[in-house]
């Protein structure tokens, strides 16, 4: 970011967000180390007299690649032109999107695995252990966890929890600043949980 903080409008949005979040029973807050995320969470923490755990892996997913439409510098891996990314069928597949030559050159999968591995470590501490494409419920609970992060990173987390290619999310959804995405765990059979998204952006 050019300015790693909030604009005047951004501070107003963070205030509105705090009015929404202070009505919830929140177990833990987790926040990116970047100034924008920390400033966005600050009104909520102040009103609730709480603190947030800062996680380096929640910073924006700013791994740089050689994107086809930008020839003079490396750039973030989303916001491709539709005519470029939609031609590679691998981008639509949860287990093949990273095989594109441009992604391989920047080890996108390695960075992706680091972030999603950290997410799984955190979820395991809250009783949910990754098991294939689902989660083994070690300790069933209704804890609400709140993450203050960034669009590109959010799509990485969602792609892992929902087993979707991040390319589809990076190019198919749009999240406004200070917006809220909600996921719930669903345990249709005892001991096995899956994540379902009930609201985005």
What are these regions (language model features)?
Residues 17-95:
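Phosphate-coordination/substrate-recognition cap region in phosphate-metabolizing enzymes
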Residues 3-19:
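Short catalytic helix/loop segments, enriched in acidic residues and glycine
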């Amino acid at each position: 970011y050019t300015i790693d903080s909030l604009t005047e409008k951004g501070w107003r949005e963070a205030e509105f967000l705090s009015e929404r979040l202070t009505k919830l029973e929140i177990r833990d807050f987790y926040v990116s180390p970047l100034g924008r995320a920390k400033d966005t969470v600050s009104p909520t923490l102040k009103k609730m007299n709480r603190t947030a755990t800062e996680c380096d892996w929640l910073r924006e997913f700013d791994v740089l690649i050689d994107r086809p439409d930008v020839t003079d510098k490396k750039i973030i891996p989303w916001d491709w032109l539709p005519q470029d990314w939609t031609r590679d069928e691998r981008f639509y597949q949860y287990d093949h999107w990273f095989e594109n030559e441009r992604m391989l050159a920047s080890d996108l999968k390695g960075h992706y695995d680091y972030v999603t591995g950290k997410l799984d470590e955190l979820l395991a501490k809250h009783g949910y252990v990754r098991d294939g494409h689902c989660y083994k419920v070690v300790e069933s609970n209704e804890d609400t966890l709140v993450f203050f992060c960034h669009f590109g990173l959010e799509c990485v987390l969602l792609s892992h929890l929902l087993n979707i290619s991040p390319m589809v999310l990076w190019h198919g959804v749009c999240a406004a600043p200070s917006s809220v995405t909600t996921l719930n765990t669903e345990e249709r059979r005892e001991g096995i949980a899956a994540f379902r998204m009930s609201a985005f952006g």
